[in-house]
Amino acid sequence: MEQVQTPGPPVSGVGQRAAANGWVLETNSLTKQFGPLTAVDDLNIKLQQGEVLGFLGPNGSGKSTTVGMILGLVRPSRGTVRIAGKINQEHPEIVSQTTGAIIENPAFYPYMSGRDNLRALAIAAGNVPDQRIEDLLRLVNMSERAGSKYKTYSLGMKQRLGIAATLVTDPAIVILDEPTNGLDPAGQREIRGIIPRLAEEGHAVLLASHMLHEVEQVSDRVAIIRRGKMLREGRVGDLLAQGEYLEVGVDAAEIDRARDVLARMPWVEKVDVRDGTLHVAAPADAGSAINRTLVENGVFASRIAAQRNTLEELFLELTEINADAGETGEAQA
């Protein structure tokens, strides 16, 4: 079993590469149309150094198209991408100078070692000291296997080497698109341990992932999109605090009556039934009022407890609400 090595000293020399307004990456009214289809619709995203932004959306929501426009691979129909204050379409060199990205499965020479693969990238980039390669291998917990041929690596090891490869040129922005896709739980945990360190060392990390619990654990902020439109953006803690509710347990035979009784109370915003319990959107100190109201109507509450939504619950609630709104023009990228 591979052992997780103790992280070494910081490996980043990321300088002050943000624009004067503090954002290292900023999209303004970013829009992409493919014929009649609008894949990305007036999207505004901001990212500063030293933070992780979780970029979330269902399949076909426009995440990949957005990443393509940030990297200069897809030309916007309207709007701009600013990297370190410069519009990437006007200054295409700014992308290679400041951005590292791992999209799907990274490609390496199979008969070369992990260390030599990174050295090859360093030679191509120029002015990368040998010590940086060793520091990066230590950062991604690959020092012990760095001399082995790439073709002998597990999927998790290949993914970690891919992250190291994005850091060879010490980019200000690191884009990780589904970095734990296909990994076993141990591999996912390894990647989760690496991502916060990137932010701690000054990198701005854009994390596109379907692993909602993973994003919740490592992100400072999240941006949730559907059909190319922004649904919600903000700090993880603030968004989850908005989803606080009271969970009320009642007998299954009484659950519909309890829901109807509570829904009539002026201090209750909403009542849902989930997994056989009532989820009541009401002030956190409303537990005694809920209990009293139910008793007065002949319903016994077996449990009343304050809860808060997980990021997964918030994501599902937002995307389901917008799906029910009957939007048209489903994005495909």
Language model features with spans:
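ABC-family P-loop ATPase nucleotide-binding domain
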Residues: 1-31, 321-333
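ABC transporter nucleotide-binding domains
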Residues: 22-27, 32-226, 232
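A short, structure-level motif marking secondary-structure boundaries and short turns
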Residues: 104, 117-119, 179-180, 242-245, ...
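ABC transporter nucleotide-binding domain
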Residues: 192-281
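Short, charged/small-residue-rich alpha-helical element at the C-terminal edge
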Residues: 245-321, 333
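Short, hydrophobic secondary-structure boundary micro-motifs
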Residues: 111, 303, 326-327
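Generic structural signal for isolated residues within well-ordered alpha-helices
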Residues: 94, 120, 135, 238, ...
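A general structural signal for well-ordered secondary-structure junctions
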Residues: 53, 108, 143, 173, ...
